[in-house]
């Protein structure tokens, strides 16, 4: 089998043709059925267009047809661009234009998105289009089915994902078949997945961790089960019902499950593997999950999209670590690391901004202008600047310190927001905490949001003054039932920062009004 993503599915097809590749909405789809469906869709796409498009957009949800559409895009031999139907149409249009998308593969979940895109001036041939949508429709023709997936070269772009850009314009990250081939070869060597495994699929298909779910499973002949939102309320029952053996999510999912009482000792006995990525993993979250899933090996994974899904792994062992956070572990074999100091020059010590070079590195952003400041040449190698500050651990792996842009100056004191978060979590009654910086009259104040028991602000501030310099103790405290999550189910720090700023401005306006009333 070749090393492409299509080749990984073909490997699963050879291992387990009549076992379910997918169980979505209660419907099992075997490897043979999904393969045949994807061949029909890919062939129909190529037959319906005069020339293969440079890229196909896949605006889909997580229903049974979504996965056939994604696989069909790969089978057609062109670049796949997963699109989130819930995103604003103007943003999706920017992605479509940046990636050179020439056709769409859609499912029923995409109908509102297609209508909104059409209103934005997008009119693209659309295959498997839901009824009533405004795009030019391509016919699904079984007679046009491909006999086999179209071949791809290692240097060909397998997929493009988009990350947020500092300009507000999404940045397109192309990932090649060579990138993914190296990645999955390492994972095949590290893990023992097989046809009897059942994988969770918590991530939306436009999030790169979904590629881990799908192609780890499909390369092993295993089954993928998309997790519906309502399942988190009764996760132990859902996991048991599905016979799930492999779990992968952001750490925020642990908070959701804890809140519904799903982390009781032994509550998740069927799990063999548990993976977390996308945000920092606290030791408390790891401990609680390990108690609920005592038969599972737990790993903390880390990696920006530019380095193909994940680039480090740390196998969890109980213990205390810096800022009470699980280390991110060692960088994958075959890669080089470089640390940069605050001045952007190579650092001499064991702490700095993590830069990585190697076979999982993207060729560069779709728009070369976005490369500026993100890549550097050092001793003949091209490195990606992750923007993450790390410290070397005793075992040679890496401890995550926080984002470069999450290090702020407060009253002349440099502070890591992650350090304030960690200190707040040690306060009795606090379950989770996130600190944000609020601009105030040319300087910055810190505001802290927390979940758990509504701890009085004075008590929380007193607790923090025992652990932190007085200058960096937050000025504002807000209790929430739950921290907001973004579309990738990570804690939405931008929303919290906007909320804190709005509340600070509202409070300031109220004080001004009171002073005016008193002076009258």
Predicted features along the sequence, with ranges:
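Conserved pre-ATP/AMP-binding loop-to-beta segment of ANL
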Residues: 145-162, 169, 193-199, 205
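Conserved AMP-binding/adenylation subdomain of ANL enzymes
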Residues: 171-198, 206-245
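Gly/Ser/Thr-rich phosphate-binding loop
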Residues: 219-222, 248, 258-325, 336
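Conserved structural elements of the adenylate-forming
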Residues: 38-40, 154, 173-194, 201-202, ...
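Conserved AMP-binding
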Residues: 60-63, 84, 193, 203-207, ...
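AMP-dependent adenylate-forming
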Residues: 4-6, 104-117, 124-150, 180, ...
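ATP-dependent adenylate-forming carboxylate-activation enzymes
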Residues: 60-64, 81-96, 108-111, 132, ...
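AMP-binding/adenylate-forming domain of the ANL superfamily
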Residues: 1-160, 176, 282, 286, ...
